[in-house]
Every structure is written in structure tokens, then in C-alpha cells.
Amino acid sequence: MKKNIGTIISISGFVLKIEFNESELPEISHALEYKTHQGTYLAEVVQHTGINTVSAIAIGEVSGLARGAEVINLGHPIEVPVGETVQGRMLNVYGKAIDGLPEPEAEVKWPIFREQPLLRELDTNKEILYTGIKVIDLICPILKGGKTGLFGGAGVGKSVLMQELINNISMMGGNSVFTGVGERVREGIGLYNELESSGVLPQTTVVLGQMNESPGVRMRVALTGLTIAEYLRDEEKKDVLLFIDNVFRFIQAGSEVSSLQGKIPITGGYQSTLSKEVGDFQDRIASTKNGSITSIQCVFLPADDIDDPSAVATFSHLDSTIVLERSIAALGIFPAVNPLQSFSRALNPTFVGERHYQLAVQVKFILQRYMELQEIINVLGMAELSDEDKKLVHRARKIRNFLSQPFYVSEKFTGTEGIFVEIEDLLSSVERILNGEYDERSEREFLFIGSYKDLK
């Protein structure tokens, strides 16, 4: 078969303008292969700019690339290997090995652009996926087959919480796909080593597009990880865990690509197609009658702004929202989850039962009231509160401290052994605190314990 070859006529950053024969223009989203002194890379057609010219985004390096260089139209979108061959491997955006092992033998390859499941194929039956992390299981439970977002600014513990969730949920069995989008290289290597030492790597695929790579790589690596998860769901009919760190970097890469194309941005400098790009991506993360994809996604908040357009565009697609707050981290309480800003549609009696629901509502009420009283305490002190309010403040502080927890993934740094808390122990502990059984105890005794059984 004759190769369809084009010629690069201009290079502007990562945007390539390429000339083809008029009758052989590649389609939008098709992959183009080009070579530099560093290796062979792909570009993606994003626009037809003339009768015989296209604009493409380089999904790789462009150093050393020059006008006049040849480009081969592959005739299809980027395709990545899927199935058993990629289990236990660390891959890049093209599905090529970056773990120092031989390339995965690609018996099957799937394009990274796929249609979302049809409405009649979706499975609406959901159940709770208990994580062993107290504040999540109590206040914002995760749905199996649902989408959960971890929102927070820089340095509040999103990645550590994500790694603990990977550790706790992966231990229950099943297949996992971790997609690192625009994050630090050391985090990817650290996660890979953690998975290897815990014995869950053989059932996990790690796909990385680091922050030092081109915006095209960071924009498309999320689709590579999602495609691998979709194959496990649709063809192997398995329940899959999809971890994405970080959705903001995916959006940011799209913004960079949009700017490179000269498109007019919206508020905050984001691309005008922000909602559609996020929607297309999120709608593919779905549970069907074949199997489920349970996704847990980190979302960075620029300047800790929960109203940032990137966060707002993501909110509507999620079943559970877990918000981490700097003021809680400053108190030394980890995970630094704000129970009042976090929510889950699974927190209703249908999913969790009446007892769990009522306890969660009481916890939210007592913490909200404590926040209101905190302003009085800051100005006038505890002495000005009524006896009833003083009792409420002490119980609220015990609850706040009790929701802290030592993690398995941070054992080597803290020297404290991680704890997985069963849901019954969690509910019994909260019940006892709310009922006043521990009113005589110090608030500090409730920091970083598992349940009431750990109180001496």
C-alpha cells in the first residue's frame, strides 16, 4: 500500500502546518508520523487550513524538526496496545514501554478516540465501595462504578490520599489503571515501586505523561489510560479502577493547545471548548452491563479557588466530591478533608442505610455549629459560651480529630503504622462520641487512631 506522505511547511511551537496532495488530506484526529534526531513521534490532525494543508499538534518532541521534513499519514487515530499484555507495565502516551522491559506484544490495539457507551448499555445499579478511610466512608462514600474527585490546592495531600486509595482498594482485587497526567516524574516512579512492593502491580497498568512533556502528550495520555480501562470493561467484562492524577493538567494542556492554535480564551485563560472536552472525556468513564469503571480523579485548585472554571467544569460529572483544605492541613490533621464542603450522592439511606445517614448528618451539623461558634471563641473566648455550646465544641473537636488517620503509604515517613477502619467500627466510634461517652477524654487522644477500640 502506497504511503501518504506530506511535507512540513511551517512549525510554530508544537503546531505543525503540513502540505499533502489535494486528494489525500488526512482526516481530523488521524495520526501523522514524523522523525527527529531524538526518535519517531506522532502528531494529531486538528484542523484543515486549506485545500491541501492541515494543522497538527505534535504529541512528542519537536527539537531538531525542520521545514521540509516528511510526515507519514497513518490513516487512523493513535492506537495503543490493550489487554493482558499491558498489565503490570508502565507505558507512555503511545502505549510504548518506559519501564525498561521489552515492548508489550500488541495482539490487539484500540484507537484512543472512542464513542461513549449508549444510554441503553449503561448500568445504573450502584453499590458502596468502602475504602477503610474514615472521613471518606462516613461523609462522602465512593460508589462502585461512580466518579470521585479529590479537590485541593498545592501541598494539601491529594496525591498521598490518592495513593492510599489505590493501596486500599487494589488490595480487594480486580484490575487497575493509573494515569499520571502532567505530574512529577518522581511521583510516577514512587507509585510504581509502591505497587510492585505491595504485590498488586501484575493487575495494574501505569500510563504516564509527565509535566516536562509537550502539551499534546499531556492532553492525550488521559485518553490512553481510559482506552486501556475501556477494553478491560467491554471485552474482558471486568470491573476496573481508573485513577487519574491530575485532571487539571489535562485541562491545562488543552488550554495550551488552544492558545497555540490562536483560539480566543474564556475566563481564566481556559479554552472556549472547556466544557465539551471535559464532557467528552468524562462521559466515556461509565459502567455498562459488561463491567464497571470506578474512577478516582485528582483535581488541582489554582490558588485554592474552588470556583475555578476547571473545577466547575468537572463538578457536574462526579458522584462524590472530596475537598481538601489548607486550613485543616495547617492543624496537622490528615487527610485534610473538609467534611462540610465534601459531598456524595451515595450519602442517602438507600445506599448506606438509615443509621449511617443519620450519623453523617449529625456530624455535619455539629461541625457546622462549631464553625459558627468559633468566631465567638476567637473574640470572647470559651467562657462566654453556654454549657450546652461548650459541650458541643468539645465533641466537635473530638470528631474533627477522630477523622484523622495514619496511612499505609506514609508509614516510612511518619513511623506510624497505617490503619484500615471497618465501617461498623467507624459508625460505632462516631456514635459513642456523639452520645457523650467520651466527654471526659482529652481531644488529643482521638488524633490518628483507628476506632474506639484504640482508646486506652
Curated annotation (Swiss-Prot):
EC number: 7.1.2.2
Keyword annotations from UniProtKB, A to Z: ATP synthesis, ATP-binding, Cell membrane, CF(1), Hydrogen ion transport, Ion transport, Membrane, Nucleotide-binding, Translocase, Transport
A GO molecular function held by the record: ATP binding
Record-listed ATP binding positions: 152-159
Gene of this entry: atpD1
Membrane topology field: Peripheral membrane protein
Entry's Gene Ontology cellular component terms: plasma membrane; proton-transporting ATP synthase complex
Subcellular localization: Cell membrane
Gene3D superfamilies named among the record's database cross-references: 2.40.10.170, Bovine Mitochondrial F1-atpase, Atp Synthase Beta Chain, Chain D, domain 3 (1.10.1140.10), P-loop containing nucleotide triphosphate hydrolases (3.40.50.300)
Domain of life: Bacteria
Lyase listed as a keyword: no
Physiological role: Produces ATP from ADP in the presence of a proton gradient across the membrane. The catalytic sites are hosted primarily by the beta subunits.
Chief place where the protein resides: membrane
Family stated for the protein in its record: Belongs to the ATPase alpha/beta chains family.
Subunit structure: F-type ATPases have 2 components, CF(1) - the catalytic core - and CF(0) - the membrane proton channel. CF(1) has five subunits: alpha(3), beta(3), gamma(1), delta(1), epsilon(1). CF(0) has three main subunits: a(1), b(2) and c(9-12). The alpha and beta chains form an alternating ring which encloses part of the gamma chain. CF(1) is attached to CF(0) by a central stalk formed by the gamma and epsilon chains, while a peripheral stalk is formed by the delta and b chains.
Protein name: ATP synthase subunit beta 1
Matches recorded under InterPro entries: AAA+_ATPase, ATP-synt_VA_C, ATP_synth_F1_bsu, ATPase_a/bsu_AS, ATPase_alpha/beta_chains, ATPase_F1/V1/A1_a/bsu_N, ATPase_F1/V1/A1_a/bsu_N_sf, ATPase_F1/V1/A1_a/bsu_nucl-bd
Record field: catalytic activity: ATP + H2O + 4 H(+)(in) = ADP + phosphate + 5 H(+)(out)
